[in-house]
Amino acid sequence: MSRLSKEEISERLLELIKDETKPAIGCTEPVAVAFTVATGKKYMQGEILKIDLKVSKNILKNGKSVTIPNTEVCGLDIAGALGGICGDPEEGLFVFKNVNKDYLDKAREMIKNKVVTLNPIENTDPVFVEATLKGEKDEVIVILRRGHTNIEKVIVNGEIAFEKDNKNEKDNKDCDFMKELSLKDIREITEDISIEKLGFIMDGIEMNKEAAKEGLKRQKGLTLGSSLLKLQQEGKLGKDSATIARILTAAGSDLRMGGGMCPIMTSGGSGNQGLCVILPITVVAEDIKAPKEKLQRAVFFGHAVNNFVKKYTGKLSAICGCAIAAGIGATAGITWLLGGKDKEINGAILNMLANLTGMVCDGAKGSCAIKLSTSASEAVISAYLALNDIIVPNNTGIIGNTVEDTINNLGMLCKDGFYKADDVMLSIACKEVI
């Protein structure tokens, strides 16, 4: 374990999970763009005449095809326009909270009049937005980096109005400390942490269950969840926990990708990852009638493992983090919930990695529900397989000598092997913009 004491590690892990597990309305990439513009608007006097947006290719890929909440439209340009019209930076990940038809009409008028420009830029952090706002009196430049609401710098009329102190940037410390942990360390912290500190976990469980219910009712996104439910009602799909997890996770993603206004608890800064971590664990807990405290700890474990994996793969990457990192978190939480020890927990993770490694990210959109639903059901199945001693052998393919070695292999594959593949995918998915 780290040079820090176990108590310090536990507190730091809790702080990280709380920071990366917050409610959000809408996909967090358009949110990041709207939040950046809304922040700039706060520093301006008078009307916005021009908005120039520069975004990382990963922000572009993950934001261009997902529906903005309470609208039927997609696009980072319109997200930026809405941020300038009705965005409130104090709302954070709820920046789209005030969107309505009148504001949408104004945003469309801005796009029509070419008030907003959008360009991808190379060689920057995966999470990066720069917004230049020009008004009647002021010019404001806002830079967001490394987090969907992490404003790094604000420049007003050539003068620095705000600059974040990055010398003690806790994100970097968190990354270092997480990589010093093992899965066993995280499991031990999960079991030892005071249950009084995990109240926010139940908030996320209830929030994402409600989102799944709404997704089944409303015709949003791909409508995969309601379609799978119909197949189940017709007797073409079973009523086991893997299938139920598949249906509910798909429904939650339908709602989120389809512009629903229902808040969703994130994991690792992503709403889809929050759905994929929380819902499968919750379904299994309800199936086995697990005590509330055990469910809370299992979901906390799932969040922690998701974040652990993403310290290797990156916050936004070439692989589908929602299906792979979050799915790994879910299967770890499920296996622990079902009484699995380190051998079975690690085995379930290896089963997921042997199965889903290679699932690429081709951007946030309605069909993300398919990937999430696959991961949700496989997370349940992988856990039960590991508990029945069906575990992929070490040193075969992507699987290394230990589970930590394997996650490191995933990170190497993602950052070194898939780097060019991600560029190709970006050129395919964003060819009309790049």
Curated annotation (Swiss-Prot):
Source domain of life: Bacteria
Transmembrane segments: none
Protein's GO biological process: L-cysteine catabolic process to pyruvate
Pfam families: SDH_alpha (PF03313)
InterPro entries: Ser_deHydtase-like_asu, UPF0597
GO MF term list: L-cysteine desulfhydrase activity
Family note: Belongs to the UPF0597 family.
Protein name in UniProt: UPF0597 protein CLD_2616
Natural source organism: Clostridium botulinum (strain Okra / Type B1)
